[in-house]
Amino acid sequence: MIREGGCLCGAVRFKAEGEPLNVRICHCRICQKAMGSPYFVRAQFDQRALTVEGDAARYASSENIDRVFCKRCGTRLFAWRRNGTLAGVALATFDDRNAFVPTEHIWVSEKMGWVTIEDGMIRYEGTIPT
């Protein structure tokens, strides 16, 4: 199955083929700042499953990840690993924003103090253990 999405102004569009590898809510401080939100809800795909068209820009938010956003409207679309493996697609940027449901929380140790997690999903204090 192919799911499509894009930015607020329509200048950047993407297609995601297949099912995501995982769907997580990240509470890390970098995601909080990059998204301007208490957390980043994303569906993670292999980069080869994604096709992106339009005028997107990148910002190196850490040594491993670029944040991809629309140059025109500023919509934050992806957390893109520089090693060419994975990309986290912001869930709300899919045309069908209810296509995927998160199953886990990561970096709960960095969540904002007023955020409560009472959804019964798996929680990790940091990243997923290897």
Residue ranges and their predicted role:
Residues 1-130:
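A short Gly-Trp-Pro
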